[in-house]
Amino acid sequence: MAALNMVRQGLFGEILHGGCGYEHDLREVKFNDGTHYNYVPGSGDLRMGPTAFAEAQWRTNHSVHRNGDIYPTHGIGPIAHCMDINRGNRFLSLSAMATQSRGLHKFIVDNGGENHPLAKVNFNLGDIVTSMIKCSNGQTIIVTHDTNSPRPYSLGFRVQGTEGL
């Protein structure tokens, strides 16, 4: 809300670019022991799907069956307001790409061993997905999705204009 207020007051000048995303280490949420919400370090009991608990029942399956930004709205909402999307501006084109998928497999091997049954799962979701959006009024947006890497939480929020960021 503060950044949107600053945009509306013209403090950034003409808006040129935005950055946003969902960058949150969810590896301990995507696997658990079937009774705890998060993975219990040192237990070696890693589950996903029907035998898991809470989000590990459904969230991890997206990492198996999809490859793309599976949660773009988390970050794009505030940027869309700042760029007047659906108020005279619109998304014109999008190009997205993903890195290879390594983080979840490494987490399984590091915590359950190379012979853990989940070590055989083929994860399709790239560890980092980057989407580039071009707006009809000329602005660009970079959206980043990263939930499979060891990292601090970040929405990567950035508004940049002719007068600064």
Predicted regions and their residues:
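Predominantly a Rossmann-like dinucleotide-binding segment in NAD(P)-dependent oxidoreductases
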Residues: 1-122
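A structure-centric signal for secondary-structure junctions around beta-strands
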Residues: 15, 91, 127-128, 153-154
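NAD(P)-dinucleotide binding in Rossmann-like oxidoreductases
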Residues: 118-126, 136-165
